[in-house]
Amino acid sequence: MMHYDVAVIGGGIAGYSAALRALQAGKKVVLINQGQSALHFSSGSIDVLGRLPDGSVVNQPFDALSALQQQAPEHPYSKVGRKNSEKGLMWFKRTLDSAHVPLHHEPDGANHWRITPLGTLKNTWLSQPFVYPYRGNADFSRIMIVAIDGYRDFQPAMLRDNLAQRPELANTPMLTVNVSIPGFEGFRRNPNELRSIDIARLLRQESAWNALCDQLMRVARPDDLVIMPAIMGNGDGLHLMSKLQQVTQLRFHEVPTMPPSLLGIRIEEALHRSFIQGGGVQLKGDKVIGGNFAGSRLTAIHTQNLRDFPISAEHYVMATGSYFSQGLQASQHAIQEPIFALDVQQNPDRAQWRHAQFIAAQSHPFMTFGVTTDANLHPSRQGKTIDNLWCCGAMLSGYDPVFEGCGGGVAIATAYHAVEQILATYAQTKQPEVLL
């Protein structure tokens, strides 16, 4: 049997955050994840809180947590608290900074808007260096939207038309510029089938890189905001974006594209690299299929690839995600947590799972379904609390990450809070030094 201090189940942003925090504290950590996480589909920004459950828009996310506590006392933020939520987010920022993916937030602690691929504005709190933090006051003379010939995963006309609906941008010129990148013929496939990661590889060629720089400098000025799809990546995206800015002297705003999202991949690669370099053990491509329980404790877990070799730990953190990641499974009449059969908060009347209208002014109820936890994020199983198991991230009940714009923030805050409680148990059991 393999034994660890902390075993983390799930390799998304919550799972990696929990594993890294425990590893930084000197614990022996194993991380088990089945495959690619939802970070491959993410914007690469961290949303803390964009709206309250009643639909009120949030400007200062941490200040709004007191109002959130009143509206949703079972919300994960309400259980973690403002102080620990802030500490968790700032810890994450420092961790990514040290992994060479610096994230920025507004000096006054407010949300900023990021321009999405659809040309809408979305509240967020932490963004990557080449995501323009728009707050309603344009400090650019024009918006230049880059269209790459043959690349279908970015629709510049849609972005331009939607962005032009903003009243404060009504008098700001918006131009679409077409850019051709040589070398597509070397891929031996239809250039219209290329993805962002294909273009990222292509731009490693000097001729393709120089062609991109030359075309951008011919059409854009330093006082423009140049919006382009995130096509710099595959391990060195931020370095290449910095190089592009230095060569062209232009100001860029990257927008994520259809998956794979290179902005999200940057974060996952940074977290993975930090975990492995820190000495963590990762079972990638494996899946936890069950566990052994003794009273109120989880004593061991079993994986699909290591059926005859159970993994035991003093503490377990579960971050298997929601429906998308199969951390929750929905049948015709019920929602289940499929690994340990943990108790799930849900409405037994399926007719009450959603509103009559798909596009509704309030959150659909099924989005708030998830694993039931106590104030310390311990789940229960058949009504009995599991004392050495913590749940975090999208599998939790009591919130809607999409409607409220808080998915990344909740994942980080709950993971950090869970591990801080684990570390506190070690501090309590530490034997006092004997002075001779």
UniProtKB/Swiss-Prot annotation:
Family membership: Belongs to the anaerobic G-3-P dehydrogenase subunit B family.
EC numbers for this chain: 1.1.5.3
Keyword match Flavoprotein: yes
HAMAP family named in the record: Glycerol3P_GlpB
Native organism taxonomy: Bacteria, Pseudomonadati, Pseudomonadota, Gammaproteobacteria, Vibrionales
EC class (word): oxidoreductase
Species name: Vibrio cholerae serotype O1 (strain ATCC 39315 / El Tor Inaba N16961)
Reaction equation(s) it catalyzes: a quinone + sn-glycerol 3-phosphate = dihydroxyacetone phosphate + a quinol
General function of this protein: Conversion of glycerol 3-phosphate to dihydroxyacetone. Uses fumarate or nitrate as electron acceptor.
Protein name (Swiss-Prot/TrEMBL): Anaerobic glycerol-3-phosphate dehydrogenase subunit B
GO biological process: glycerol catabolic process
Record's subunit section: Composed of a catalytic GlpA/B dimer and of membrane bound GlpC.
One cellular component (GO) term of this entry: glycerol-3-phosphate dehydrogenase (FAD) complex
Pfam families referenced in this protein's UniProt entry, alphabetically: FAD_binding_2
Alphabetized SUPFAM superfamilies for the sequence: FAD/NAD(P)-binding domain
Single GO term (MF): glycerol-3-phosphate dehydrogenase (quinone) activity
